[in-house]
A protein has these predicted regions:
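Structural preference for solvent-exposed beta-strand-turn elements
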Residues: 1-287
Length: 287
């Protein structure tokens, strides 16, 4: 019928070589890499098209190698060797940098000197969204690494416009857009061609909700942009979340600047069940 739930029956996997369009989503490639060791004779994957969210593929390859899977990696090519018996190992799971982005946004929109601390983050993370630490320097957020913790501190920002290619980390688009709104910066983000096939059409959703603040938002297949708005930031705007956890969390950060209403707040449970609890620790009151 074209939608879940679906029934998958056991079958012998036999594919030897596949060609995948990497411009659609890195998730398709990661899923194939994960099942490849169980395919008799292994699997070769050739990638074509525009590169998208490659750090997530790198994380998948790194994990497979840690559990003993042999992989030959070249540009746009992976050969995964068969490994039927995988030995159990123990390793620590670091915190999610995508979730950290909301706290970067809060600090960016706060007064100079404001700071907060987040736990279990690595400076040498393979997560693509760990780039948030570098990105938010432009917004006046300094990241201080303290072992397995990071301290975010608000310092002076010298910009009033922001341009960036998010091809490697498109999940940051909503957070950055809201940060630019809150700071009154102009915004031009590109590399967003995968956002139309996320939980919702995120480009359209962003345009709809940002427009409620009086912004003239332009979107196309790959980008979103809007001019600086140095005027009064509207209060008590009602934000639709489109069943998308990132819409809820990114716009919730605006509460550091103005009152805001988030519809369907429980949507955050997809990735960050304790988000509202942690948000209140920053001083934002939710009810």
């Amino acid at each position: 019928e074209g939608y879940p739930p679906i029934l998958i029956r056991p079958a012998k996997l036999y594919a030897k070589k596949l060609q995948i369009d990497k411009s659609k989503s890195s998730q398709y490639i990661s899923s194939l890499l994960l099942i490849a060791p169980k395919i008799e004779g292994g699997l070769e994957i050739e990638l074509v098209g525009r590169e998208t969210s490659k750090p997530y593929i790198d994380m998948t390859v790194s994990l497979l190698k840690k559990i003993g899977v042999k992989i030959i990696s070249k540009k746009n090519y992976y050969k995964v060797f068969e490994l039927q018996n995988i030995k159990p190992i123990q390793f620590s799971i670091e915190s999610d940098w995508s979730s950290a982005s909301y706290f970067y946004s809060i600090v960016a929109m706060s007064e100079i000197g404001y700071s907060l601390t987040l736990s279990i983050f690595n400076m040498s993370s393979l997560q693509g969204d760990s780039n948030i630490a570098e990105i938010y320097i432009a917004f006046g957020v300094k990241t201080i690494y303290m072992g397995k913790k990071i301290k975010l501190e608000k310092i002076k920002s010298k910009i009033d416009k922001f341009t960036y290619d998010l091809s490697s980390n498109p999940d940051l688009a909503q957070t950055i857009s809201v940060t630019c709104l809150g700071l009154g910066y102009s915004c031009n983000l590109k590399g967003l061609h995968t956002l139309k096939i996320k939980e919702t059409d995120r480009l359209l959703a962003l345009r709809n909700e940002l427009s409620k603040f009086g912004l003239k938002v332009t979107i196309n297949e790959d980008s979103i942009s809007f001019p600086a708005n140095k005027g009064f930031l509207k209060s008590n705007v009602m934000i639709e979340t489109y069943d998308d956890h990132r819409m809820a969390m990114s716009f919730a950060c605006l509460a550091i600047k103005t009152n805001i209403t988030i519809c369907n707040p429980n949507v955050v449970s997809k990735s960050y069940n304790s988000f509202w609890i942690d948000l209140e620790k920053t001083g934002i009151v939710s009810q």
